[in-house]
Amino acid sequence: MEHHHHHRHMHSPSSQQHEHQQHQQYQQPPQHHQHYEAPQHQQQHQHHHHQQQQQQHPVPVPKQEQADNTSAPVLSALPAYPTLPPIWDSTHSPALSASSSSTMQASASSLSSLPPLVLHPPSNGLQPNKPRSRSPSSNRFQTREPAPLSLFDGSPTTELPPIQLDRKRSSSDHSLPSIASLNVGSSLPTLQPTPTPQPPPKFVWPNSNPLSAYYAESDNDGRGASPQHRHDRRSTSVSLDDPQVMMAISALNELKTDSVSSPPNRNAPLRRGMTDQNQEPEPLLSLITTAHPIIESTVQRSSHLYTKTKNFSPRIRSGLEYVEGSLIPVADTVNNVGRRTGIESGVRWILGKRTKSSSDTRESGQNKRHMTSRPVNGTGGEARFSEAPTADASRRTSVSTIETLPAYDDQRSPAYSETVEQNGQAVDPKSALHAQLGNGRVQVTTSSLKETMKEESLRSLKYVLETLRDVTNTLQQGTNELSSVLDQYDRSTTTRDGEDHVMTNGSAPEEDRTRLVERMTELRKSIYSNIKDVSSVVANYTGAALPENAGNLVRHHLLSLPMVWSQASKTTTSSEQPNTQDPNALVRKAAKVALSFSKEGLHIFSQIMEIIRTATDHAEDWRNKKMNQMTPANGTEQEIRPLIDQPLPQVATINGDIPMR
């Protein structure tokens, strides 16, 4: 070791010059990206020559330079290229020992078998760093020259050397980390990138309206929406195809209907609804108890007493169970016989009909509200009103009871008359009104004639009546004249066939027939035109003026006109025999069809006139009655408006409340 250190401090000019030339050749970058391959015998010769010079004249190294080289940081401006040739440096070589001479001799023989040295240019087109020229004053900062190849161990290594850079380069330059830092970083665990937290999807409660499910809030800004976010938005949407959604919608509609409607009767049995859901026949005992409330209470008390008696003692329980076991087969046999013979179905039909009628009566009684008032003489002159008993005593409303007329008969016009029902019996309205006035209570009743009570409706109906009268008279005259013209034409044709040429009114028979044909054509067109005009007037002015049942009947008559014309055409064609000798046979046939259609049209329009006249007369009578009832006692006239349009007066009650309008 002492010998080794002694020779390292010695300087040999020839060896330094040779090493300097080799350093320049080694640091020379490849030109034009071409591969440089050194001959194998030249590499061996250089290696052997350096080995001999190293043994004779070791190269001394200054201590300060050694310290600078060992403490200098390793910087890298270029990535490590795996294609670069291995460059051996003294910093990465093992320490030389006393037996280095023998090791060097062994490595000389091993180097002869190494492949040729190949320098590959970088793949990204970057040139390796060249050492900059330094001044003599900055000699200690200059990169140390590589040691001779003879200093290295005989076994080659694949470790890449550090790339020395200029220390004066600014730290702000973009540079890659060193190889040492990369090696240290590779041993550390890999840190996964922190995922960006996604905002939670906005939840919207579904609306009770089914159409709003299709109008979900749209994402106008599609740039920041991710696929996961869109998936979350789609997951909160509501589809009408989902059966659960449909069930929820139906349940909400039922709740809304129940909240708006009047409260149900708590005493009404629920067995009927349960039967509809379970699809099982209701027991006869339940039907009987539902139809007869007295029997229901008796059966319930008896059943309760029987249950208590059965649980009183074990002996009584065993005896009753024995009796039940004997009677149950008998009851099943009777039930089967009644089902097969049809007795059970008849009893069920009777009891079900009675139950339905009683329930309808109760519901109609609950839906009606009566406005009652009773004048009381007070000191303050205020009128006090007494309320009729209702299901909800807190509600003080004044609503008139609406009673509809019976349905129209398809064959006859209904009899319009106002009736007041008391206890299920029809009573004359005058007597009922006097009875109510005598008791101090006034009950206001209306009917489906409220549509005809309006001024616009009455004017429309009166206009239709006048039009029908005029058109009916015109049709009647046209029908009579057309019938007379047809008779004259038939007589003229018969006279011509008998060759009895008689002049009529000083004209020839041919001229008379021509005149009759023209008259038949005019009358036929007039009949069709009048029927068309009157049908349009009736359809346009009676649709909203008449009550629903009367309007349906009028519409039925109007729609039957085309069928009547078709029937008249068939009847005329079958009854008349074609006359090939008469050139005006087609005109005569068309006149016959128009005559038959005119007669049927007169019959239809007379029925429509009767319906409208009856409705108008009874509406006017009803208004006159109301006007007479509201006429003051002093006989002065005042403006009378329809009762349904009059607002209720605001009067104070006992508690100071004002009835609702």
Swiss-Prot record:
Name of protein: Transcription factor ccg-8
Bias (Low complexity) ranges: 23-43, 107-140
Region (Disordered): 1-69, 107-243, 255-279, 354-398
Superkingdom of this protein's organism: Eukaryota
Bias kind Basic and acidic residues: ranges: 357-366
PANTHER family the record matches: TRANSCRIPTIONAL REPRESSOR OPI1
Annotated S-S bridges: none
Induction: Expression levels may be influenced by circadian rhythms.
Species assigned in the record: Neurospora crassa (strain ATCC 24698 / 74-OR23-1A / CBS 708.71 / DSM 1257 / FGSC 987)
Lineage start: Eukaryota, Fungi, Dikarya, Ascomycota, Pezizomycotina
Cellular component aspect of the GO annotation: endoplasmic reticulum; nucleus
A single GO molecular function term of this UniProt record: transcription corepressor activity
Job description of the protein: Transcription factor that plays a pivotal role in azole adaptive responses by regulating the drug accumulation in the cells. Affects the transcriptional responses to ketoconazole of many genes, including the target gene (erg11), an azole transporter gene (cdr4), a hexose transporter gene (hxt13), a stress response gene (kts-1), two transcription factor genes (named kts-2 and fsd-1/ndt80). Also regulates phospholipid synthesis that is not involved in azole resistance.
Gene knockout outcome: Leads to hypersensitivity to azoles. Accumulates toxic sterol 14-alpha-methyl-3,6-diol and ketoconazole in the cells.
UniProt-listed GO biological process terms: endoplasmic reticulum unfolded protein response; phospholipid biosynthetic process; regulation of transcription by RNA polymerase II
Residue spans of biased composition, Basic residues class: 1-11
Biased composition (Polar residues): 173-187
